[in-house]
Each structure stands twice: as C-alpha cells, then as structure tokens.
Amino acid sequence: MTPRLEDARILMYSHDTFGLGHLRRCREIAHALVAAYRGLSVMIISGTTIAGAFDYRVRVDFVKIPSVIKLRNGEYQSMAQHTSLEDTLEMRRAIIRQTAQSFHPDIFITDKEPMGLHGEIEETLAFLKSQGTHLVLGLRDVMDAPELLGPEWARKDVLRKIETYYDRIWVYGPEGFHDPLAGLPVPEAVTARVRYTGFLRRAIPKMGTPAHRPADGYLLVTTGGGGDGADLFRAVFAAHRHDPGIGRTLAVLGPYLPARERAELLAEAETLPNVETIEFDNRLEELVAGASGVVGMGGYNTFCEILSFDRPALIVPRTQPRLEQAIRAERAAELGLVRMMPAEDTVDPAAFAAALRALPDAPRPSKSRAAAKAGFMALDGQAQIARDVGEWLMAPRQPALRAVQS
C-alpha cells in the first residue's frame, strides 16, 4: 500500500540554462516521489522555455522563471531581447524567494548548481534553513574535470556554502562509477552528507501519446536540447552520403538547435532517403526503447535511457565548455556499457559510417559483466531518493531557531 503523507511539500530548483537535462531529471524524481507517497505535492522551479511541453503527473507542477541561456563560450545572456541579464536575474531571484515563502516546502532540492545561477538561490536557502526546511543538493554522477570545476567553485566559495546550507548531497549514480567531487578539497562534514543513489531508471511514459511512432529498427540520433549538437548531426548525414546502406535513422534535432543550423540540417536531410528528422518529442524514452542503436553525446539523461532500455550506444562526447560527457563516456566505454568515438574521428565519413553500421550488433549494456558485478545496472536511484524523503517527512520536524548568515 502506498504510504500517505498529508500535505507534504517538496520544492525543486532547476536553473536550466543549456539543454533540457536539469528539468527532465527533476521531473523524473518528482514523478517517482508522488507515486511513492500519496498526499505529497512537488513544485519545480524551472528556467527552460519549454517547461510546459512536458506532461506532469497529478500533484506535480512547475513555476516558470525568466529564461537565461548559456552561450558556447560559457557566458550567459537573457532570452528576453530587451531585458539585461542583471534585471533578468533579479526577477528570477524574486520569483524563487516568493515561491519558497508561499509554498512552505518541507524539502528543497537543488539540481546541480549549489547556489543557483549567479548565486540566485542563496538568499532563499538561508530563508528556508531558518524555517527548518530540509535542504538537498542533487549532483550528476559526473560534474566536470576537477581542474576546471575546482577553480570555479573556489571563486564562488561553493564548498563552504554547501557545508553551511545543505543537509544531504545526493549523487545520481552508483558509488564506484565516478566521484563527482574527486580532486576537490571537500570538507569532512560535506563528505559525510553524500549519498550515492544509483542511476535514475527511465520507463515509457504512461501519460499522453507519442508525437512520433516510427517502426522499430532505426538508429536514433539525439543530442538532448540540441544547442551544441549540429556537428554530430552533420557527421551522421555525411556518413549517410558516403554509405546509403547504413539504414533508417531518426535524428531528433532538439528545440535549442540554432535556427540557421536547423534550416541547413533540414535541407540536407531532405536529400537523404534513409534519414528522418524531428525537432522534439517529449516522450524520448519511447524513441530510445524502439531504436536498434542510439547515437548521442553522453549527457546524463541519454545515458540513463540507454541503460534503462538496454540499447547499444555510440557516444560522441563534447569537450567544451565542460568535460562531463567525455568523462562519463570514457568510464562507460571502459566498462563495456557503450562504444565511444572522439568527435575528431567522426569527420571521416567512411570511419563513422562503419561505426554506425556496426552499432545495432554491438553488445548491449546488460552484457557488461564488470558493470553488473559492481551493481551499476541496478538503476534504483528513485527508490533510494524515496526512502530518504520518507524518513525525513515521517520524522518530527525541528524548526531552526535562527537564520543562517551568508
């Protein structure tokens, strides 16, 4: 029987400046929690422009904050043409703070950015800490190379602030796969709060109907939001021109692919009889499940879907502005979970075509004895998260006596 938690509330923060990964991860966790506990409500604060394009379960809702986009050089800009970044950030801070004050969450979960975009949630964290709210930081299995992440966090004094505010740090991966904080001067108090949840299992959604129902047996090419995916799509299309016998390929371009590159790719795809392109599908899980192989860049959500549906995969990771995808792909390839191809090797159409042709017959992740022995295929992240949440919400709440001084 599903336990009932009367009027329990969880607020999640997803800064969403590049791609769809943060919102999709928050949504997956939110759906698992409301399924585990009747009476629980989850609100997601999201900055993505297409938050409303996804289906949400009953008792899961979202608050849209003004959108900011991360450029390829790592800088940020407001997506409102006539609003400065500073003004946009101030609006975001105000909405986040007001939502926290009005929603009265029992638990606040931050996705990936400990203090939010440009520190926009620090004031809210201090307020919630003073109210006795349980504060949780959720981190991907891989953040970035320590030589890149370390200086960035040092400038922002992030580790001290994590120690000050957060009660628990979830790592959304299994212990032993990768330590996202490796190489950083992590305080012992922070290390003691870390819990590895395992990867987040994906399933075919029960809500709504898919926008696209291709027959099974296609290669699926996905780069997530698509903001930096043009080079991979060009390489796939060049491979098809070199070898038209690769077979049916479905390319999901992504809603954030720049308009000029989108137009060029759509025009090129029209000349390739075995290539179909779509912009977006909010049920990507169904497309992954039906594919004979998946070609992607190795973002967290795509990787979890590859494992969940046990699809042969070829990963071509990006290396700018972060090394996250490359680190994950190298580790997964080492374990035999995926095949990896450096981006510079895909510029050879013959070599890339051969890799695409071979992909459907490549070993599936479930064939990796090393990963199975280590427990990396358990994919039980949602269950571990739900256990933690249940323990906190069923325990007597102890309000803090004073506000935290930042």
Positions of PLM-derived features:
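C-terminal amphipathic helix plus adjacent low-complexity
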Residues: 350-406
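A donor-sugar binding/catalytic signature common to diverse glycosyltransferases
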Residues: 283-327
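A short, glycine/small-residue-rich beta-strand->loop->alpha-helix junction that serves as a flexible
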Residues: 14-27, 51, 229-230
